[in-house]
Amino acid sequence: GIIATIVISLMKSFGVKIESRLVWDTAHRLFGFYSLLALFLALMLLSLLLGRKETLLGYRDILKESGQGNPDYLKKYGDFPTIFNMGVNGLAMTLILYFLGGDFNGPTIGSIFCLVGFSATGKHLRNILPVIFGVILAGTLKVWSVQDPSSTLTLILVTTLAPIAGEFGIFWGIIAGFLHSSVALNVGILYNGTNLYNNGFAGGVVAIFLVPIILAIKDRQKPMAIYDEEAKKLAIKDKLFDKQEVKLPKNIFWK
């Protein structure tokens, strides 16, 4: 994103004009939906049949991950739990896109496969749903619709911010998704849409802005929590002393 911004800025300075165009298929929506539905259901069923209990136990552990640091689910939990997680995430995104009226074409299917691929290293249902909901919420309040081509891609690729939801909770995940929807739809102006990874760049901008704010708020909350804990300890000690339950160890002054 930074490189594209610099290059496009230089080109504009020399009078070079870059025209953008939109190629967006809307005629094969049902075919794309049913194809993805069959694929992801097959992934889930095969992993359950072959892995059985191991699959479910591993998937349960995957859901406990925050997603930070690109954890390798294949190494930590094995093949079947990871494949099951990929199927679950792909199925969830496919259903969400379908019921929101989104299109299934090259860009959207490719974006869903991107989500599925990264489901082997960090993403799972618990940390992607909050950021997705943030984009859906934004679509009901802002001037654009989730069915718009650029908004549809943002809805899928906002999962780049899944670690924020995994680490800091559902509330901050929704906020991250809400902010990302605006940044991703406007940051492309900097490089005239020439950056393929527009949502990745926008996600980085949102993370750089939001994470320090979250940490600052949490740091301010820590002293109060520590104070409350110390106050509880002192109250317990005073209560024990009043009841004369505090006993000195024997032979502390003499043998």
Can you name each region flagged by the protein language model?
Residues I83, I128, T152:
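A short glycine-/small-residue-rich loop at the edge of a beta-strand within enzyme catalytic domains
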Residues I2, L91, L115-S119, I136, ...:
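Transmembrane helix-bundle signature of multi-pass membrane transporters/permeases
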